[in-house]
Amino acid sequence: MLSFLAKKNPIYLIIIKSIFYFFIFEFGLSITINTYLVILTYSSRFFNLFYQTFYITLILYILMIISLYSSKKIFHYLFYLFFVLIAWFYHNTGGAIGLYILNKVIIELPSIINLLIYIIFGTGLSILCIYTDNNPKFDTIKIKCEKLKGNLTIVHLTDLHLGGAYGRESVELYVNMILNLKTNIDFVVITGDLVDGNIQVTKDFLEPFSLIKCPIYYITGNHEELTWKKEFIEMIEKETNLIHLPNNLVVFDKRINIIGIDYKKNLDETRGQIKYLINKENNNLPNILIHHVPIFKPDTLPDFNLFLVLCGHIHGGKCFPLTLIKFFFGRWLTTIIEGLYIHKDKFFVYCCSGVGTSGPNSRCFVGANIGLIYIEGN
């Protein structure tokens, strides 16, 4: 599909062909909405999990430019290999795109076979991934807390990304799932990215939450920062039953502290706020921190007497290969991708894969999850 990139075409022709090829293959043969630049942009996410840097995207762009104008095939193959890996990691049709490129450039299967492989594999995988995204499940977690009086049940929602591919009907689905639980819920937390992009989300989107009678605590994520945050928060506080915890602490039922920290890039500032809030209350109750971005290296958090950290943002790695990292290397890597982690027997970190995504509503072998957390106390 991208073999034309290896030729010395004029820039305008490359752009025209890129648009044409990706329009045909992405919109015509598949049922997801991806573009070349989206994949390049998302490529940084995988490496960002480990290095917290976007330099890897720059490397990919450099490789692409060199491959366009160099006669040495090693650069072409490096770019194609890089592109295949990135595409496979980050979009459901990425595997199909990568397979097509690999066949066309390296294996050189006949074009008609490539086309059939792409149609069957790409469309089939797309259907599976869209189905997965539209059928969220509960991820049940059970933990113990000796300092807690009685038991607690918490529902953890994250990364709804309303306003893009998700609307009121998505909220209705999540709310109905919660209401149909055969257990009493003490409170719900939403750990950021309630909205997606700069599309306005109105009160109507959030109205189904009013059916939930227990408290719903909410903090912002990085996508609220990208949009009309001030107006959205004002609407949340005035017209919905969501309780915004903007860098605040509430004592729930005189049994546990809930610390809400809105999204911030500066970890030092976040640490300072956590320490200030805990010291200010100083009631010796267990502390639950709700925060959007996972604490990638829990060692960076001093001993704040935390019991549990709830977060999202990573979408479970978004697709299948990343989930293997957790199972095979999760105890050696400090990176938190999905699920429950125990940090040095001091506190728990639960990273929920969430129910939405930014962009096409699809997930590659990573379930859309709502956290259901049972805490057993004394």
Please describe what each predicted stretch is.
Residues 1-136:
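Non-catalytic terminal accessory segments
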